[in-house]
Amino acid sequence: MPRLLRGVFCVVEIFHKYAIEDGGNQATLTRTELRQLLEGEIGDFLQPHVFHAVERKLNLLNFDRDGTISFEEFVLAIFSLLNPSYFDISLLNSEPRLMSKSEKIDAVDLGAIGGNIQQVVGVGPTQERLIFPSEMASSGQPSNEEGEVGDEPMVSPCEDIKTHSLPRNVSEPNDPENQQPKEDAQEVAQNVPATEYDGVQFKRNTVVEVPKQSTSPTQEIPRERSKPSRRLSDTKISDHMIQRPTEDEEHTSTTQDPFLQKRDKATGSENTDLSVVAATRKSSQTQEIFEPMDDTKLSEAQETGKDAGRIPPETNLEEPKADAKVAESHGLPAQEREHNTRDQSVQSRSRNVSETSSRGEQEGEWKEHERITLSPTADAETQDEKCQEFPGSWRENDAKKDSAAKDPSSEEGNQNLPEIKEDSVSGKEARHSEEDTVYAFEINKNSPAAEETLETRERSQELAPLEKQSQRKKHRATRIQDKPVRKEDHNEGEDSELSLTQSDEGFCEIPNSLAPEVGKSSSEIAEPHVPEDSQSQIDHHGDAKQESHTNNPDPQKQGAPGESSREQEAVVLSIQEDGQLPEGQEQSARDGLHDGLSSRTKGGPGAAVEPSEGEEVQEATAGRENRKALEAESLEAQ
């Protein structure tokens, strides 16, 4: 109202201004000019029907019928205009005051059910209908009554027809978890006021159609963040909502059940530990399983075409263990495999938690597994070395191959040894060598030289690439010669003993491949080849010996018997590579080597080196003399 009055005063002043401009005391305006003035000044406050009323009033104001309105007539017209304006303003102020109660009730109802309103499929969000003034008094009451009783909302007959045509089941009829709340059956109304001239008021209703609550508690409450899914039951496709707990419910569950959560965490940690243990157990089992399977395949490939009695009892120490491991691998139950698979799936989910602990446990088990695996293989290698000290025995190479195949860790120690092809040996030599093997094993049982063979083999592995580059053509003889030289750099006090031991080992392997091959004639071998090969081998040995003297400050302790034995071995190996010798020459060379070695051991550095071809000594007697000399040398070194 104050704004309207200010607008009226502005109009009066403008009217007076126009009148002054016209000149004279009587200022006049036409009806058109006055209407334009009123619309421009106070048209924002007035409705269009007010201006129609002003035109009728202006016709009455033109008393003199001259078509102009004087200032006095204008003042009367203005105050006559204020009557309908005041009436409209009073209606605008009074009608919201009447509807405020219902609006407050609707606001309360909407706040109560705001989180649970779900629109029904097929029902429009808004519906318009006519409400007469008799219905206005009761417009705010049905929602309140429906909120208390929970009955079906009041709608017109037309809306009843539309509602009955819709599916009445919003959710699945057999869901025992949820119920429809009472506040869902609400009618939200917003009344737009109309003037008294119209006589009819328009009411815009936002109706949320919710079916009547069924007697059986089988309805489910639709909630936010829920996933819609469809089910087909009793030939009716209905939409239902899968309930998810809200944040309040999750908070209450966490506050009410702390003991259950602690129990769940404890069980989760136990499951994680079990998964870690199962995974490490499985990894250790697979590592133990794969090696024996490969070993058995290699041993089967090597044993093809051989007699069962050829293998001595010392070389079969690892086979029962490998067979037991293979049987264990094939005997794993299916349930344990499934359990390991499930444990791996659990472990992948808890990898960030158990990664550190699982690595530590796996490393510990792997180290223990290597320690257990290497302990029997070291014993087997020691026994193989003891058996190799006897010259002429043909089973040591077979035992060495079997032990290398059964333990991949001992493969490094055996890679520098020469690969000697086994030929057929007569039955008499086999029986003779077997008896000497047993005798040698009993004598050398407590000898310190047998204990250091493994260390010698590891020492020889480090310098193997240098020897291969210098002697690619005759690598077998080079490896046999360089072993005592490399051992001389390791320990000064044990040089003579170890050189003799390695000489015996190399000599043990030489007669195995000196048997004559079928289809080749001995006349094809030329004797001048022997001095050339022996000279080349001796020259190379001199270079290697010179290198060992530079590394060892005390050359007096370098074994002279080792030098003579290496020279003789070079001669025999050169004969072996260039061709085949008759059995007589082979036996004489072998006897010469034994006699030279024994004479060098007993007589000192000045003893003769050349072998005597006239002597014919039995192989076992030479072996016994050689072992006695070796024992005497080892006692002197100690």
Swiss-Prot record:
Q: Where is the composition biased (Basic and acidic residues)?
A: 221-246, 294-309, 318-328, 358-372, 395-409, 419-435, 479-490, 526-548, 622-631
Region described as Disordered: spans on this chain: 134-638
What are the residue boundaries of the EF-hand domain, all occurrences included?
49-84
GO terms (molecular function) for this protein are: calcium ion binding; transition metal ion binding
Tell me the domain of life: Eukaryota
Query: InterPro entries, alphabetically?
Result: EF-hand-dom_pair, EF_hand_dom, S-100_dom, S100_Ca-bd_sub, TCHHL1
Q: List the disulfide bonds.
A: none
What spans are recorded as compositionally biased (Polar residues)? 166-179, 343-357
Query: Which SMART domains does the entry mention?
Result: S_100
Family, according to the entry, reads as follows: Belongs to the S-100 family.
Protein name from the UniProt record? Trichohyalin-like protein 1
Organism expressing this protein natively: Mus musculus (Mouse)
